[in-house]
């Protein structure tokens, strides 16, 4: 009896080993094809590539293939063509807008809400990283890599040369500062013809009505010939005269270069650009400082501590591409992303780094 039992146990063990071996043999190497709207120098993309290289050390068959298309119009056109021919990549970047929502409704995209629950990591993210990418129905299908706050960045020396002793407190003050800079022979604002330029028309509306005006206008419930719409148009016209020359043909890189080379006194952008604005220790370069979006002297809907924050463009995962191997890689990414992004690439990530006390002074100020 004992011999029979031992034989059965050996056979059972051998059978289990064979099943496990078969599963390992059936498991295909993980290959992720990722089309990104981020530029090659983007800190989030650099972080992902670094983590993919590290992951590959223990998973030699793993491949992380990235195609970067920084021009947003070209990028969107390609994604729409791929979607129409049912050839979307494993990963691709998207915003929570109508086209992407349509893909989600067709059940093509894996739920990030479900993914974070499955990995047990949802509570590690900043609230904005979970709320900003939500679709109109409240669900989330996008991984977000950044925790961004938007500021006006300025050269202290240029302000001083123009006789400006304090940063503008109101939108009207901002126009006065621009005039002083221009009268002193300087270019007030470095601007570029890409999505951030649309912040300027939104400033006045945001201060007068919060997000309601833009949200309602987007849904056709508000018109731009209303009192707020007219005030918004007038302010945009007033401030546009202080944009850098040739801004309509300038992109984000040229806009940053102009500012860094003292070609303009101010730049409005988010903390995703801090790698260009800080020194090796992660602190702002000596001549650069920042101020929040000024309030409006007449509007009371939003105050000085209400300003634009976002988590950047998100990344979607094709539902048919999801696998246990994919989840293992994503789990590895999120276990290491925050520290790698913050301490190696000076980027504020979408979740808190492991040791907040080590954060640069600028980052602590933002948080």
Which residues fall in each region the model found?
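Extracytoplasmic/periplasmic solute-binding protein
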Residues: 136-145, 150, 175-221, 264
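Short, solvent-exposed loop/beta-turn-alpha elements that line the ligand-binding surface or hinge
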Residues: 111-125, 209-231, 279-283, 292-306, ...
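Alpha-to-beta junction loops
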Residues: 82-94, 108-110, 185-188, 261-270
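Conserved N-terminal structural module of periplasmic/extracytoplasmic solute-binding proteins
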Residues: 2-6, 11-101, 105-106, 119-123, ...
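Extracytoplasmic/periplasmic substrate-recognition and gating elements
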Residues: 30, 53, 57-58, 63, ...
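Long, aromatic- and glycine/proline-rich binding clefts that accommodate carbohydrate-like moieties
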Residues: 291-295, 342-367
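Hinge/lid segment of periplasmic solute-binding proteins
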Residues: 95-151, 175, 200-202, 228, ...
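Glycine-centered hinge/linker elements that transmit conformational signals in sensory
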Residues: 178-181, 218-249
């Amino acid at each position: 009896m004992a011999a029979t039992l031992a034989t059965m146990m050996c056979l059972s063990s051998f059978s289990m080993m064979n099943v496990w071996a078969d599963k390992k043999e059936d498991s295909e190497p993980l290959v992720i094809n990722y089309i990104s709207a981020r530029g090659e120098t983007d800190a989030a993309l650099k972080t992902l590539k670094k983590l993919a290289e590290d992951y590959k050390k223990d998973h030699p068959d793993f491949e992380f293939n990235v195609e970067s298309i920084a021009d947003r119009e070209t990028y969107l056109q390609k994604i729409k063509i791929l979607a129409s021919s049912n050839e979307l990549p494993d990963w691709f970047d998207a915003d929570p807008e109508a086209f992407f929502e349509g893909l989600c409704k067709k059940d093509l995209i894996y739920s990030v809400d479900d993914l974070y629950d499955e990995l047990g990591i949802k509570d590690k993210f900043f609230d904005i990283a979970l709320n900003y990418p939500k679709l109109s129905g409240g669900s989330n299908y996008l991984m977000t890599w950044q925790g961004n706050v938007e500021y006006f960045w300025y050269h202290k020396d240029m302000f001083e040369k123009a006789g400006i002793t304090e940063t503008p407190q109101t939108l009207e003050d901002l126009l006065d500062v621009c005039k002083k800079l221009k009268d002193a022979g300087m270019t007030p604002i470095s601007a570029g013809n890409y999505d951030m330029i649309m912040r300027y028309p939104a400033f006045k509306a945001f201060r007068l009505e919060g997000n309601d005006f833009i949200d309602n206008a987007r849904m056709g419930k508000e018109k731009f010939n209303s009192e707020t719409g007219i005030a918004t148009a007038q302010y945009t016209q007033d401030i546009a005269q202080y944009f850098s020359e040739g801004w309509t043909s300038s992109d984000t890189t040229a806009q940053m270069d102009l500012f860094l080379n003292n070609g303009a006194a101010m730049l409005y952008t988010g903390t995703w650009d801090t790698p260009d604005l800080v020194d090796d220790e992660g602190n702002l370069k000596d001549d650069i400082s920042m101020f929040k979006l000024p309030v409006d002297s007449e509007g009371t809907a939003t105050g000085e501590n209400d300003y634009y924050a976002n988590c950047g463009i998100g990344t979607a995962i094709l539902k048919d591409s999801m696998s246990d191997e994919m989840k293992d890689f994503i789990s590895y990414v999120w276990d290491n992303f925050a520290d790698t992004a913050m301490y190696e690439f000076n980027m504020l990530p979408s979740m808190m780094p492991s040791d907040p006390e080590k954060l640069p002074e600028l980052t602590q100020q933002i948080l």
